From Swiss-Prot:
Family: Belongs to the universal ribosomal protein uS12 family.
Signal sequence interval, chain numbering: none
Protein task: With S4 and S5 plays an important role in translational accuracy. Located at the interface of the 30S and 50S subunits.
Name by which UniProt lists this protein: Small ribosomal subunit protein uS12cz/uS12cy
Record flagged with keyword RNA-binding: yes
Lineage: Eukaryota, Viridiplantae, Streptophyta, Embryophyta, Tracheophyta
Keywords: Chloroplast, Plastid, Ribonucleoprotein, Ribosomal protein, RNA-binding, rRNA-binding
Annotated localization: Plastid, Chloroplast
Summary of subunit composition and partner proteins: Part of the 30S ribosomal subunit.
Family annotation (Pfam families): Ribosom_S12_S23 (PF00164)
UniProt xrefs under NCBIfam families: rpsL_bact
Keyword Ribonucleoprotein recorded: yes
């Protein structure tokens, strides 16, 4: 327990909270350009080819973002919107690409959970 004199000399430091998505710089989303689109394999109990993209953001960061949904049209030089949100079985992937905005089209033939994949209501 410090004395009053010690606290005057060296005040208590506030606890700084660490963000889980530092590349967004406190914004809800960021725009970026795909520099590479490829697939990676998930961690141990799971097995798949997960679609990811390397994205250079307007904040200057180069990040790896997951492309959700079945099928995509993203390629190099595609302009995409990136949100936070990690993928549990892909180490180092802490961001998601938002489908249905900018160059990333919505998922084709999606009926349920459409808002998460940028799909308009079917007629």
């Amino acid at each position: 327990m410090p004395t009053i004199k010690q606290l005057i000399r060296n005040p208590r430091q506030p606890i700084r909270n660490v963000t889980k998505s530092p590349a967004l710089r406190g914004c809800p989303q960021r725009r970026g350009t795909c520099t590479r689109v490829y697939t990676i394999t998930p961690k141990k109990p799971n097995s798949a080819l997960r679609k990811v993209a390397r994205v250079r953001l307007t904040s200057g960061f180069e990040i790896t973002a997951y492309i959700p949904g079945i099928g995509h049209n993203s390629q190099e030089h595609s302009v995409v919107l990136v949100r936070g949100g990690r993928v549990k079985d892909l180490p180092g992937v802490r961001y998601h690409i938002v489908r249905g905005t900018l160059d990333a089209v919505g998922v084709k033939d999606r009926q349920q959970g459409r808002s998460k994949y940028g799909v308009k209501k079917p007629k």
